[in-house]
UniProtKB/Swiss-Prot annotation:
Molecular function GO labels: DNA binding; DNA-directed RNA polymerase activity; zinc ion binding
Domain of life: Eukaryota
NCBIfam families reported in the protein's UniProt record: rpoC2_cyan
One Gene Ontology cellular component: chloroplast
Subunit organization: In plastids the minimal PEP RNA polymerase catalytic core is composed of four subunits: alpha, beta, beta', and beta''. When a (nuclear-encoded) sigma factor is associated with the core the holoenzyme is formed, which can initiate transcription.
Cellular location(s): Plastid, Chloroplast
Native organism: Lactuca sativa (Garden lettuce)
Protein name, UniProt field: DNA-directed RNA polymerase subunit beta''
Length: 1381
């Protein structure tokens, strides 16, 4: 420094700190004035001075110097409290996932930034000479961000793909990291496996693809003769002077530049620093420059279109491989950028919005016409200012005026009282060049299972008109109605029907399949059971376990009913086709010692409601005739007198009738216990055939015998049956009969041994083996069954019904279900005897069928259901009549156990029109609906007060029943309530009964009002609102199981039922914490399933908020599983300050994978754009210019996007390199099928210039469309198949080239390297022999004329850019990227 000062006569002393930026400027001035050699000598002295001063200061660093900021604890607690409130809002459906993520990131980012700002004052006050504090601002090593991670908090991190991890690292490196925080930190590590592997491989592969695309681009000519250019102008304000200078330096002008009448630059002149300075000084007209886009060469480039060489300040030399230079220039920063700047370990850096706070307490006022309601990016309601808004805050003594800039959010309402320092507005942060936001997709996945519904209209995306992709036009909720879908493979069938209820341990899809306690909402559409029941049950087949069927199951959760009947030898597939459903009746006759089964009495009525003669109306399975162990059943039967005529021995659709083979009188029969094991063929059996074993003997590896006896092994198909016969073995001299039953004391009279027996015995003759003639006798004990009367079904019905009258007769019949003399039961439970109630009527009547339907009787708010059976003739010939005009059909007010209406005292008839009786609070009115216009002839009611028993809720142990409300409200007649949480629905899946609701509002009672509906609903169904507001039954939603835990029952007390407004309607969706009445319970989120007098049932649902433009995956009512994609948001997010995000972005642009959302009315915009182009320019040139502009603007947009990524990382890449790449991926066109050409085949990819030249040569229009090829696809569509084969898919490319007979002219570098030839660049480059100056005069004159025409076209295309830009800006949203460089 002394030498410098001695040689400078005028010494200047600057007393200020020189940081890194000032040092760069100083060194640059040294180089300009003294040269490189003298500057390096000066810098060596500066280095020596620095080392000397650092040694004298002797600064050291220890762990004690890392002082944690005291305010960190309460700052982190405040951020956690805000995050908890945010999570609650997301759970309620007030904010969606993107808003939650965005707000969570900003909460923690603001906390981290505040800690970083507190770091300097804390050090200054506590320890100003702290080594950490001094080093953090020296610029030599480390920066403030790294010190902040040491003593503040690490904050938010980015993953390898650049996506934000919303779990912040609250600890700093001084305190130490937890295991989770350490794993998250590993993503941003410098030399970690994640960092090195992902970045290096991605950058290397990107470079390889780029070089593949442009390896053949070589400078081969001086001038291609183009007259086209790209206009660049700094006037529009979208381009800074620095970018303007970088764009122009090294280029060649495409036209002369004039200032007034003076020409300051000529065509084909290269642009240097001096010329650019004159452009900026004089603010010249838009400058037209030559670029690789405008070069007319097909497979190379000319000197003037490329410009100056990057290595020296002169035009690029001929033979320069500019393509490979371009590819490496773009790919190289990806591998090197991580070593350039200080590495902060993937820590997220972003920006927060500025807040405007109230200066004092007061009332706020503003002009409401200048704002419109919207949502902030955090999901809060706000007003958006369209222009400057003046807000007045009136306090007691002073009035404050605050100006809110445009595009800001106002967070308060007009005339609202605000407190001092309260945030009243939010100003959007201005986007800078180095901190640009990007659009990303965020997929939201379902975290529960159920049906999807929405409560707004949706649009189909244009490309998914017939798919399940929908676009949301406005903010609304998507609902997942909770349920448990069945996952079944093809083949197994469900035995459940719609609205059935299931037992906790029940048979649902496969035999012995355990299902959750739930209520099904399933339409049977699949195979009914399994292959066991595909046909008739032959002797010896295994019968699955049916012990749980056909009964009311009393579990811990609720009293439920099992849905189907399974007979051992019935064809269940035929049953499913008959669409049979069952109504269970549970009856308790108080005071009588009747045998009432747990299963109750089941009624079986076909879905179409038509009953034939001798149909089984009700049946009862006696539990004493159910065998739950394996064995043989021996019957002794005799035929009953048939109650069916021979001509009626046909099976009517949907009805079970008596066949003579079923009509066996129940005589005593016997059960012979036998132990049976069904084994697979591969099982290793540890006992031998015909061996005798004891009890508890090991049979297979995991099975032991329960009893001892003789072992027989039988093979059948792919299974083995191992049978153990218990009993005694005898070897008599002669055996007369093979099988025989011996009663107690039976046998030979002289036999003393058999006289001592007190039990039945079963004797059967057996062979030791198939080939021996010797027999032995096996004597087994027998369990006898005696005939019992069983339950008297007649006691359940009024005595009039059991008397044979002129109309209907009911007859009790006991019969056995199986007619085989010997029935084998293997490992199962089976019903042997059934008691049935048979419906019949007079044989003389020419009536072939009866119609069954249901009647609802409402008495004092208590609903009862009765069965009505009508004898009906053909509906066409019937004429109605009424015998008893006084029969009003009213039930007496005392509500006795027996219905006081004599079923046969009157015959009701109705007209064909539907009866529209309103829900009247009068007592005892019978509401009914005719069965699809079928006429009625007679009425029969099978009833007792306990037929449809509704148990008290006190017996129910389902956790979702609010028991506290039961205790608080003892006045509620819970016993009379109906619903899914009681003993089950009284009616299951019966389509004939409907609930009539009129157009007016209906008072069910005087303390609850239902909203008015205009639909007719089926009773006790799930009513859902579709997107048009119509209420319907979701028959399309099959195989969904409603768990009782998903149904919440809310009781309304009498005191506030009167205050309930009709806001709760059927099918309505309610968010959590909504109160439907004063002092009422706070509801959980869900859909109103049933509205009753004193309660509502709400099905649990999970709301998901979605904003306009979101993409919904799936159809309305579709069943979703956990983890399915529900909705996709497209939102803007800040880019982290690391190249990790840059590389995927560059690759995304160059591979042409767009993530920009498509406008929902894009087609209308394009139509309008075409019309405006036609109107401005006239019809002849409109579409030509439109196609030209499309290609030019797409190329410029791609260049700008790539440059934006690299400039945000501080990397300077010249536009020419990117332009060469973009030129190659946009230079192909796709030949279309319109007006098919004789030259190219449809679908063929050809070069754009080649297509234009071929069209001019043939004087024929070639129809094509421009396509954007990604760099991978462009590498596979070149003129050299050797280059393509060396890139990827070698065998396929070579085989295809051989079949097509392609010729490789070896013009590129790579194909010559592969074949060992001289590469056509550098010294191997040969100058073209034909130069433009050797052209004859006549051809030159024609070229000159042609150039004049092209100049006129250029005037139209490029000198009227303002016209096109205004048109484009009105039709495309991304005007910045489409404007200029």
């Amino acid at each position: 420094m002394e030498v410098l000062m001695a040689e400078r006569p005028t010494q200047v002393f600057h007393n200020k700190v020189i940081d890194g930026t000032a040092m760069k400027r100083l060194i640059s001035r040294f180089i300009d004035h003294y040269g490189i050699g003298y500057t390096s000598h000066i810098l060596d002295q500066v280095k020596t001075l620095g080392f000397r001063q650092a040694t004298a200061a002797s600064i050291s660093l220890g762990i004690d110097d890392l002082l944690t900021i005291p305010s960190k604890r309460w700052l982190v607690q405040d951020a956690e409290q805000q995050s908890f409130i945010l999570e609650k809002h997301h759970h309620y459906g007030n904010v969606h996932a993107v808003e939650k993520l965005r707000q969570s990131i900003e909460i923690w980012y603001a906390t981290s930034e505040y800690l970083r700002q507190e770091m300097n004052p804390n050090f200054r006050m506590t320890d100003p000479f702290n080594p950490v504090h001094i080093m953090s601002f020296s610029g030599a090593r480390g920066n403030a961000s790294q010190v902040h991670q040491l003593v503040g908090m690490r904050g938010l991190m980015s993953d390898p793909q650049g996506q934000m991890i919303d779990l912040p690292i609250q600890s700093n490196l001084r305190e130490g990291l937890s295991l989770t925080e350490y794993i998250i930190s590993c993503y941003g590590a410098r030399k970690g496996v994640v960092d090195t592997a992902i970045r290096t491989s991605d950058a290397g592969y990107l470079t390889r693809r780029l070089v593949e695309v442009v390896q053949h681009i070589v400078v081969r000519r001086t001038d291609c003769g183009t007259v086209r250019g790209i206009s660049v102008s700094p006037r529009n304000g979208m381009m800074t002077d620095r970018i303007f200078i970088q764009t122009l330096i090294g280029r060649v002008l495409a036209d002369d530049i004039y200032i007034g009448s003076r020409c300051i630059a000529t065509r084909n002149q290269d642009i240097g620093v001096g010329l650019v300075s004159r452009f900026i000084t004089f603010r010249a007209q838009p400058i037209s420059i030559r670029t690789p886009f405008t070069c007319r060469s097909t497979s190379w480039i000319c000197q003037l279109c490329y410009g100056r060489s990057p290595a020296h300040d002169d035009l690029v030399e001929l033979g320069e491989a500019v393509g490979i230079i371009a590819g490496q220039s773009i790919g190289e920063p990806g591998t090197q950028l991580t070593l350039r700047t200080f590495h902060t370990g993937g820590v997220f850096t972003g920006g927060t919005a500025e807040h405007v706070r109230a200066p004092s307490n007061g009332k706020i006022k503003f002009n409401e016409d200048l704002v419109h309601p919207t949502r902030t990016r955090h999901g809060h309601p706000a007003f958006l200012c369209s222009r400057d808004l003046y807000v007045t805050i009136e306090s007691e003594d002073i009035i404050h005026n605050v100006c809110i800039p445009p595009k800001s959010f106002l967070l308060v309402q007009n005339d609202q009282y605000v407190e001092s320092e309260q945030v009243i507005a939010e100003i959007r942060a201005r986007t800078s060049t180095l901190n640009l936001k990007e659009k990303v997709r965020k997929h939201i996945y379902s975290d529960s299972e159920g049906e999807m519904h929405w409560n707004t209209d949706v649009y189909h995306a244009p490309e998914f008109t017939y798919g399940n992709i929908h676009l949301l036009p406005k903010t609304s909720h998507l609902w997942i109605l909770l349920g448990e879908p069945w996952r079944y493979s093809l083949g197994p069938c469900s035995i459940h029907k719609d609205q059935d209820q299931m037992n906790a341990y029940s048979l649902s899809v496969k035999p012995r399949y355990i299902a959750n306690p739930s209520v099904t909402n399933n339409q049977v559409r699949h195979k009914f059971f399994s292959s066991y029941f595909s046909g008739k049950n032959q002797k010896g087949d295994r019968i699955p376990d049916c012990s749980e069927l056909n009964r009311m199951t009393c579990t811990d959760h609720s009293n439920l009913r099992y849905p189907a009947i399974l007979d051992g030898n019935s064809d269940l597939l035929a049953k499913r086709r008959r669409n049979r459903f069952i109504i269970p009746l549970e009856s308790i006759q108080e005071g009588e010692n009747q045998l009432i089964p747990s299963s109750g009495i089941s009624m079986e009525i076909p879905r179409n409601g038509i009953l034939r003669r001798n149909s089984i109306l009700a049946y009862f399975d006696d539990p004493r005739y159910i065998r739950k162990s394996s064995g043989l059943t021996k019957y002794e039967t005799r035929e009953l007198n048939s109650i069916v005529n021979e001509e009626n021995l046909i099976e009517y659709r949907g009805v079970k009738v008596f066949w003579p083979k079923y009509q066996k009188e129940v005589n005593p029969f016997f059960f012979i216990p036998v132990e049976v094991h069904i084994l697979s063929e591969s099982s290793s059996i540890m006992v031998r055939h015909n061996s005798i074993i004891g009890a508890d003997t090991q049979i297979t590896f995991n099975r032991r015998s329960r009893v001892g006896g003789l072992v027989r092994v039988k093979k059948k198909a792919e299974k083995m049956k191992l049978i153990i016969f218990s009993g005694d073995i005898h070897f008599p001299g002669k055996t007369n009969k093979a099988f025989r039953l011996i009663p107690p004391g039976g046998g030979k009279p002289n036999s003393k041994e058999y006289k001592k027996l007190k039990n039945w015995l079963y004797i059967q003759r057996m062979k030791l083996s198939r080939y021996e003639k010797k027999y032995f006798v096996l004597v087994q004990p027998v369990v006898p069954y005696k005939k019992t009367d069983g339950i008297n079904l007649g006691r359940l019905f009024p005595p009039d019904l059991l008397q044979e009258s002129d109309n209907l007769q009911l007859r009790v019949v006991n019969y056995i279900l199986y007619y085989d003399p010997i029935l084998e039961i293997w490992d199962t439970s089976i019903q042997l005897v059934r008691t049935s109630l048979v419906l019949n009527w007079d044989q003389d009547k020419k009536i072939e069928k009866a119609c069954a339907s249901f009647v609802e009787i409402r008495t004092n708010g208590l609903l009862r259901y009765f069965l009505r059976i009508d004898l009906a003739k053909s509906p066409i010939s019937y004429t109605g009549k009424r015998n008893d005009l006084s029969g009003s059909g009213l039930i007496s007010e005392n509500g006795s156990d027996r219905a006081n209406v004599n079923p046969f005292s009157s015959i009701y008839s109705y007209s064909k029109s539907r009866i529209k009786e309103s829900l009247n609070p009068n007592q005892g009115t019978i509401h009914t609906l005719l069965n699809r216009n079928k006429e009625s002839q007679s009425l029969i009611i099978l009833s007792s007060s306990n037929c449809f028993r509704i148990g008290p809720f006190n017996d129910v142990k389902s956790p979702n029943v609010i028991k506290e409300s039961i205790k608080k409200n003892p006045l509620i007649p819970i016993r009379n309530s109906l619903g899914p949480l009681g003993t089950g629905f009284p009616i299951y899946n019966f389509d004939l009964f409907s609930h009539l609701i009129t157009h007016n509002q209906i008072l069910v009672t005087n303390y609850l009002q239902l909203d008015n509906f205009k639909q007719i609903f089926q009773i006790l169904k799930y009513y859902l609102l579709d997107e048009n507001g119509q209420i319907y039954n979701p028959y399309s939603c099959s195989n969904i199981i409603l768990n009782p835990f998903h149904l919440n029952w809310y009781f309304l007390h009498y005191n506030y039922c009167e205050e309930t407004s009709p806001i709760v309607s059927l099918g309505q969706f309610l968010c959590e914490n909504v109160c439907i009445a004063k002092k009422g319970p706070h509801l959980k989120s869900g859909q109103v399933l049933i509205v009753q007098v004193d309660s509502v049932v709400i099905r649990s649902a999970k709301p998901y908020l979605a904003t306009p433009g979101a993409t919904v995956h799936g159809h309305y009512g579709e069943i979703l599983y956990e983890g399915d994609t529900l909705v996709t948001f497209i939102y803007e997010k800040s880019r982290s300050g690391d190249i990790t995000q840059g590389l995927p972005k560059v690759e995304q642009v160059l591979e042409v994978r767009s993530i920009d959302s498509i406008s929902m009315n894009l087609e209308k915009r394009i139509e309008g754009w075409n019309k405006s182009i036609t109107r401005i320019l006239g019809i002849p040139w409109a579409f030509l210019i439109g196609a030209e502009l499309t290609i030019v603007q797409s190329r410029i947009s791609l260049v700008n996007k790539v440059q934006k990524v690299y400039r945000s990382q501080g990397v300077q890449i010249h536009n020419r390199h990117i332009e060469i790449i973009v030129r190659q991926i946009t230079s192909k066109v796709l030949v279309s099928e319109d007006e098919m050409s004789n030259v190219f085949s449809p679908g063929e990819l050809i070069g754009l210039l080649r297509a234009e030249r071929m069209g001019r040569a043939l004087e024929e229009a070639i129809c094509y469309q421009a396509v954007l090829l990604g760099i991978t696809r462009a590498s596979m569509n070149t003129q050299s198949f050797i280059s393509e084969a060396s890139f990827q898919e070698t065998a396929r490319v070579l085989a295809k080239a051989a079949l097509l007979g392609r010729i490789d002219w070896l013009k590129g570098l790579k194909e010559n390297v592969v074949l060992g030839g001289m590469i056509p660049v550098g010294s191997g480059f040969k100058t073209p022999s034909s130069e433009p100056n050797n052209i004859p005069n006549n051809i030159a004159f024609e070229l000159q004329k042609k150039n004049l025409l092209e100049g006129e076209m250029k005037d139209i295309l490029f000198y009227h850019r303002k016209l096109f830009d205004s048109c484009l800006s009105n039709n495309f949203h991304d005007t910045q990227e489409q404007s200029f460089f």
